[in-house]
Amino acid sequence: MKCWHNVVRRRRKKPTAAAAAKGSKGSHGGVASPRDEDAICQRQQQVDTYTWLTTQAVPLLWLHLLLLVAFAKHAAAATTIATNPEATTTTVSNYTVTTTALSSSTTTTSSGSAPALSSAADKFAGNWANLEDSFRNIVRIGDGNTVTRTSIEQSLVTIHDIATENLGTLCISTLYRPLQVPINSERYESSRQKTDLAASILQEVGIIRHGGLSDALAKGLLTDDFITGARILALNLTNGAVQSYVWWVKGTAAEIQRYDEDGLQIGKKPAGSYPWFDDETSSPTLRSPKFAPSPPNNYYKGWWTYPYFSCSQSRWLVSYSIAIPPIGRHGLRGFISIDIDVSTLRVNQCEAEPYPFGSRRQKMQQLQTHNRLGARRSLFLGSRMGAIDESTINDLQAFHSSHKCHRTSMVCDYRQPSAETPTVTGGKLLTTLTGSSSWTRGSYQCLCRGGFYSLRHPDGFNGTIMEIAWQEQQDNISNYYSEVFKCLPCAPGCDTCTGPEPCLANYHWPFRISLLTISIGCACGTFVLAGYLFRHRRVKVFKVASPIFLMITLIGCAIMYLEMVAIFPYLDTTWCIATKWTRHMGFCITYTSLLMKTWRVSLTYRVKSAHKIKLNDQQLLQWMVPILLVMLIYLGTWTISATPTAEVILDQSQLKFKQCSYNWWDHSLAIGEVFFLAWGIRVCYNVRNAESLYNEARLISYAIYNIALVNIAMVVFHVMLFPNAGPDYKYMLGFVRTQLSTTTTIALVFGPKILRVFKGQGDKWDQKAKVRSITASFSLNGVGLVPEESPDLYQENEELKEQVQKLAHQIEFMKTVHMQMNNRHLKPKPGGYFTITSTSFQAPYSKNTVSTAQTQTGKDENSTPTKLKSPKGKVXRGQRSVKDCSIEIDGGQGRTTLVEDAIEFNFHLADTEKGLIVQEDERPGSDEEEAALIAQFRRLFAPILDDSLNLYYQLNDLDDTEHVRIHQTVAQMNDLTSSEEETMVTQVNSPSPPPVGVELLLPISSDSSTASSSLYAIHTPSPAHPSGVLLMPQNLESPLLSGSDAITITEQVELHNPPHHLQLLEDENNTSCSLSSNLTDSKTLDGRTPIVV
């Protein structure tokens, strides 16, 4: 189709020439007639059909036959590429592997090649593995032609014989020795086009009509740089005899000479030994075995020969011949042929990238094919295959990758042979005959690849020796090729070596397995401990330590233990990723959980305000999650963007082993962890003096110190002290770091707790913590010493603040009381709660060691029995004191005593006042009611006074000492002076609202040298509070005596006599009973407010 298309295109381009051709009566004036063009296209179509049958149909039949034979014999052995170079292939653009069968183009090769191919087919059929060789046996060169491996090997033998003068009778009997491999004709495309043009001219003009035209055309062809000889023959169409010929050759000095050949004689046929000529009678279409097949998709007017050696010219030549058809039936048939010297080309048997000849579009197509097949080509081509360069322009591409080096262990290196290069037979290369030494078999050196070595031939193996050794192995003469001429593999891990010395560091597997077993056991023990903690999470020793944070700590420790699993095997990318994640994520989880608990203690310990800092587990988890999220995002980004890989490092013996790479991701994370450790150390330093339940804060601080110290120490060991340590030493350092940091943390945090549980003290509170008054704020879970049901912390805080305020008010109240009692240096405040009635200070102790507590109420005219309740309408009740008081009452018949406690309240009447006591005989049961009233008084005031005095004297030891000294001085002064006071006692027996008569006695002077102060009180029953006691203001005007003068009502209360063997300070403390009320509110009691019991 392409031929017909070209014909149509030429007709359109030259309509004038076609018209001239029609009027010339069949003569051709330089333009082919349509009839000739049609004949040419028909002949080309026949040639293409025949080519397809010989190159594709027949090989397909052979392929099916080989498959059937292979499946029938069931071969199991496989011959490797190293021992069978025939199994190699090249897959560049001109070496594309085809799927045609192992067969020759029956008419394209010499008669001797068919038996060789048949024997090769029989050889391959017996082995299934060698079936692949049939696919690799046929290769394609740059211009599209195909060639078999057998043809290549036979051509190499021919080249070797010629190069080593092993010619025999070649140049005597046979002047030409052709090869069986085609040459890439694209390099001589310009020469071919010139020859086609000359053939077209001769065809149009005619050979005999112009005698000088043939000489002119032959000489013109010699102007081409590549053409060294041109010949034009005029042959008889009937018998094929030579009618005339011209043969011009280019001399050594570039002069043109006529060449006379004995094989060409007028009237005789040309000799059949000429490789550039074939008779049309034997080969009508000139598809002779002497000619190489034309490249596909290309139309040539003539045929290229195989390269051949010319003994007469002593050079390697290739010819292009064109048969010129006759003009008529009885005309002459022309024949034109040119010779191109290819002696300057070289036989390069190594892998090389072919030079892309042809047009620009063809070069681009070849480059695209080269890029597309690059991955597959790298499996077969040597390591020296590089980019397309100018050094391959002179290579015979058919011989590429035909070397005999072992493919897996050797690489071919082309060496240009010199004239002095010796051969195996002891001779030298033929340079006088060939004029060049580039046409030599074995012009290469087999060098050991990286990872292989040869002790006998460290510089490589000579290519000629490798060719002979391979041929001997093929002929079963010797096995030196596979046993002697080979490279041995280096020890594992060696890129290059010169011997069998090891390159990888040795791994002591029993030692590593023992450390791994311990680490896995610790990880399993951590999970068991987590289950034990979950089961006993309600035990107080675990509950106060936040079980959720303890569980998180155990999870982090288990992850840190698993790092030993990640660094156990030979490291690669997967294990390096696992190493980074287990190391840093485990550290972050463990360290953060411990730090959060310590931070809670730090914040509570440093607080200076009265506000409660509420830090429960949920809040700490909310602070912990962002820290873990930052680490998670960092490790994820690291893994995706710059995946950690295993890099090779050297130990002190220069042995290699793999270690995970360290880059700026590691350095940045290390800096962040250092700052994190520094913050943890700062927090632990702040709580160094803080007290906590079970001493947990201090143990966690020790654990954090230990983690920081161990990590810093291990960095120093790895980087500074042992930078070239071997893999076992590094694994041991990792084990030590894991055990010192993780196991020690578990022992410090969980060891004391588990020990207490085993001792049966898990549910018992820490007694030392109780003694140190450890509150809930200093507990690591924010609860402290609490029952099972935790109360509201805010309510607890408010109650504590209220108690503190009440105690402060009581202390201030007692200070005022003790300052004003019997202190003559202070002027009493009018209307105060305690008022001294006499300006003369009375001694607290009389001569008979009886002290009198004097109390006087202020005067309040509006004080009535109906206003005897507290302002809030509640009755203020006292609390029973731990230190009870006993009360004695002197009645009319004698002394009535209530002995319930160690301290007594004695109500004595002075001797001078006994006569003024109102008779109570008319009221039955007065003594019992009086005793009940006094008991109520004791229960109200005694406990408050006792607790307040104890607290006051504890806080004011110096003031208490001075107070006792003042009392001693006043007592001595009272011994020298005496005074009398009038005392009146009235008893009101009627509870009814109407006025009841009260019998009053006149005051009688007391015989005692000392008199007590007055405590004014009225004993009046009331409906709400029968037999109640009402403390009235001073100078209270009785409603019974409203018309008379105000009468002062007193009641003397005398405390019991202190023991004589006690010191004065102790006596002073024991004689004090509380007179204050422990009310529900925290306000200071007003002195004028009545208290109802």
From Swiss-Prot:
Which residues are noted as glycosylation sites? 94, 236, 462, 476
Those parts of the protein on the Cytoplasmic side are: 1-51, 534-547, 608-619, 682-701, 752-1093
Which residue stretches belong to region Disordered?
A: 12-35, 849-881
One Gene Ontology cellular component term attached to this UniProt record is: plasma membrane
Where are the Extracellular topological domains?
Answer: 73-512, 569-584, 641-660, 723-730
Other observations noted: This protein is translated by readthrough of a stop codon. Readthrough of the terminator codon TAG occurs between the codons for Val-875 and Arg-877. There is currently no sequence that provides the identity of residue 876.
Which family does this protein fall into? Belongs to the G-protein coupled receptor 3 family.
What's the protein called, per UniProt?
Answer: Probable G-protein coupled receptor CG31760
The record lists the organism as Drosophila melanogaster
Per the UniProt record, the lineage of the source organism begins with:
Eukaryota, Metazoa, Ecdysozoa, Arthropoda, Hexapoda
